[in-house]
């Protein structure tokens, strides 16, 4: 794909013109360029903790998908919490699984009677560079932050803490970026929750040692898996996997004709087989390994195509470098389509790629949970995932999909699915029902309400 990008830093927008074929252009905007004023500085206090607008949602709309019993249980749990003031604090409102979850969770909390808000902390590029390094180190990367980067992280947390309004019943802090808020201003909420969305099973020892004093005393903390809980947490620890919203444009039912039409607009030959991975362009997601798997498959199935589809997040400056590395690894192959939101790939387009693909892949080498797994399986398509993190929670190997440990295994399973269409259909059908039971938003809302009730009673 040839990219011609015209970027305006002052206005924070990018226009991308894309034509079919392999992606061979490079582009790397700074997150500060399109999320924060270039001359903002720390003196622009009015821009700290920006509220995020969300559309309204109605819990009853999920009854036909999740069942009456769960909906009734949620309303019963919400009754004593009506009128409670709840704040979600995160690093970004754009890109990544956390923001996608909150665009559904916040309006549903409002629908059941909570006064719920979502606020995004202020940070410039120096902050996001430090927190991206922290994110990788907490998932096992060897490089820790230097003292200047730790000081940058603390300084921005202190600034945001000063501007956080008080009198919250619950303040729910997402991930390490704003994690210091509870230690800095505990008096601004009666109940505090730290929600960790990443894999802390084998963190860099220096990094977790620096972070632990800021997270250890949260009254409640939530992790995707028990293995992710670091030693030393003093409050109550909860294991709560995230979930997807089946009613969003990304996950709603899409006809085969519509899916094929959308894919065709991006240069996909809809009459040829397609492998697809939807994820951030991040080393842990291993898009380079997916390309390697595709090449093995293509030796046996010359018509095979590959789509790598990702959203570039505003708190991920390193992502653009790896996006360009992925393009380089594709080496100009016209059947490798590397796409992101700057190619006008939005929720409907992701839905189309997932619904149309013959095999869906998430070949992560480290993974906090991997919501793209449940999103993919919800489309009832055959799925292959890396045997890491939260992916095995969503996949029963050989029953609802396949778990793999290498590019070669991924290619082997892909070839099995292509050779037996009935196998792919049965994997997809069983996978969809597994997601319906365990990984849809109403279940996630129920788990949060239980925790809020515990905080209220304590």
Label each PLM-derived region with a short phrase.
Residues 44-85, 103-167, 240-246:
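A conserved catalytic-core segment of Leloir-type glycosyltransferases
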Residues 264-285, 291, 306-307:
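Conserved donor-binding/catalytic core segment of Leloir-type glycosyltransferases
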Residues 310, 314-352:
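Nucleotide-activated donor-binding/catalytic signature segment of Leloir-type glycosyltransferases, i.e.
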Residues 370-373, 391:
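Short glycine/serine-rich donor-binding loops of glycosyltransferases
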Residues 397-408, 416-421:
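Conserved acidic donor-binding segment of nucleotide-sugar-dependent glycosyltransferases
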Residues 423-438, 444-450:
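A short, well-ordered alpha-helix in the C-terminal region of glycosyltransferases
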């Amino acid at each position: 794909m040839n990219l011609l990008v015209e970027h305006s830093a002052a206005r924070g927008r990018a226009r991308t013109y894309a034509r079919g074929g392999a992606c061979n252009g490079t582009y790397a905007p700074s997150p500060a360029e399109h999320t924060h004023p270039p001359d903002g500085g720390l003196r622009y206090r009015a821009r700290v903790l920006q509220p995020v607008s969300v559309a309204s949602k109605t819990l009853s709309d999920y009854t036909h998908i999740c069942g009456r019993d769960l909906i009734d249980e949620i309303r019963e749990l919400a009754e004593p919490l009506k009128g409670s003031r709840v704040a979600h604090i995160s690093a970004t409102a754009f890109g990544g699984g956390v923001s996608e979850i909150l665009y559904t969770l916040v309006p549903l909390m409002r629908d059941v009677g909570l006064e719920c808000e979502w606020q995004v902390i202020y940070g410039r590029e120096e902050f996001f560079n430090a927190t991206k390094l922290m994110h990788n180190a907490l998932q096992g990367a060897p490089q820790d932050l230097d003292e200047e980067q730790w000081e940058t992280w603390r300084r921005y947390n202190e600034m945001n803490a000063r501007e956080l309004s008080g009198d919250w019943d619950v303040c729910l802090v997402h991930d390490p970026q704003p994690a210091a808020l509870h230690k800095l201003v505990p008096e601004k909420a009666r109940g505090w929750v730290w929600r960790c969305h990443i894999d802390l099973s084998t963190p860099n020892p220096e990094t977790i040692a620096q972070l632990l004093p800021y997270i250890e005393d949260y009254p409640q903390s939530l992790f995707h898996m028990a293995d992710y809980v670091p030693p030393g947490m003093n409050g109550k620890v909860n294991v709560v996997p995230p979930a997807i919203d089946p009613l969003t444009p990304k996950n709603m039912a899409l006809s085969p004709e519509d899916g094929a039409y959308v894919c065709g607009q991006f240069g996909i030959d809809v009459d040829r087989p397609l492998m697809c991975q939807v994820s951030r362009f991040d080393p842990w997601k291993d898009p380079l390994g997916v390309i390697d798997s595709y090449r093995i498959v293509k030796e046996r199935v010359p018509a095979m195509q590959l789509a790598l589809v990702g959203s570039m997040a505003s708190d991920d400056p390193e992502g653009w470098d790896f996006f360009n590395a992925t393009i380089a690894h594709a080496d100009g192959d016209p059947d490798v389509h590397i796409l992101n939101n700057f190619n006008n790939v939005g929720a409907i387009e992701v839905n189309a790629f997932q619904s149309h693909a013959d095999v869906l892949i998430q070949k992560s080498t480290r993974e906090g949970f991997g919501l793209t797994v449940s999103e993919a399986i919800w489309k009832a398509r055959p799925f292959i995932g890396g045997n890491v993190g939260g992916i095995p929670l969503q996949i029963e190997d050989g029953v609802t999909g396949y778990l793999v440990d290498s590019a070669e295994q991924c290619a082997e399973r892909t070839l099995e699915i292509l050779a037996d269409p009935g196998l792919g259909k049965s994997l997809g059908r069983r996978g969809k029902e597994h997601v319906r039971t365990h990984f849809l938003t109403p279940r996630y809302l129920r788990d949060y309400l239980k925790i809020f009730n515990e905080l209220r009673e304590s």
